[in-house]
Design a protein with these regions (language model features):
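Active-site-adjacent "lid/gating" segments in soluble enzymes
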Residues: 1-127
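Aromatic-enriched alpha-helical interface/lid elements that frame and gate functional surfaces
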Residues: 108, 116-186
């Protein structure tokens, strides 16, 4: 037997009705979605509904395997809120491991620690660019500014993160020199 509910059968909130957006809000996913200074936003798709179904599918597979080995069935209790917790990257873990000293926040279109790592305005829409240290040299060369690679303001990940606003301007200005997004991506 498998069941999916907002909070789980044995939760103190098991008698409450819940929907996708409620699970997103209750789990903190909405707190992490949206612009830094804006309100919390839901993810644009029914992620709690879908993720809970995927969790149930996976759990059913393991339960059937367990039953084939032991002859014992199980009751699988899938909570929509619980299925959202694995969606957090460092936000939940960072808060927990630092006993609340790390305060996760909405990042908007750019990662708060890594740059360039975000959604940039291109000439005919938006382009997602993600670059870690191994790719930084290639980004600088593509920008036509190889000197940025060793500029202390951008030489390593933490420096680029601290100077992210300037770096976003450099990249978006460069993108305007192309006729469209396809040309940027070539």
């Amino acid at each position: 037997m498998a069941s999916i509910s907002a909070y789980g059968r044995e939760s103190p909130l098991s008698h409450k009705t819940g929907y996708d957006w409620v699970a997103q809000a209750f789990s903190g996913i909405m707190h992490m979605t949206g612009d830094r200074d804006g309100p919390p936003l839901p993810v644009g798709i029914g992620i709690a509904d879908v993720s809970s179904g995927v969790h149930a599918f996976s759990a059913i597979g393991y339960a059937l395997f367990h039953r084939s080995r032991t002859g014992v069935g199980q009751w699988l209790d899938i909570s929509m809120v619980d299925s959202m917790f694995h969606m957090h990257d460092v936000s939940l873990q960072g808060f927990t491991l630092t006993k609340g000293k790390f305060k996760p926040f909405r990042q908007g279109n750019h990662h708060e620690l890594i740059a360039p790592f975000g959604v940039f305005k291109g000439p005919s829409g938006y382009i997602c660019i993600l670059s870690l240290q191994p790719q930084w040299k290639n980004i600088c060369e593509a920008l036509g500014q190889p000197d940025l690679e060793h500029n202390p303001r951008y030489a390593d990940g933490p420096s680029r993160g601290e100077n992210q606003g300037e770096l976003i301007e450099i990249i978006e200005k460069w993108m305007t020199s192309f006729p469209d997004n396809d040309a940027v991506l070539e």
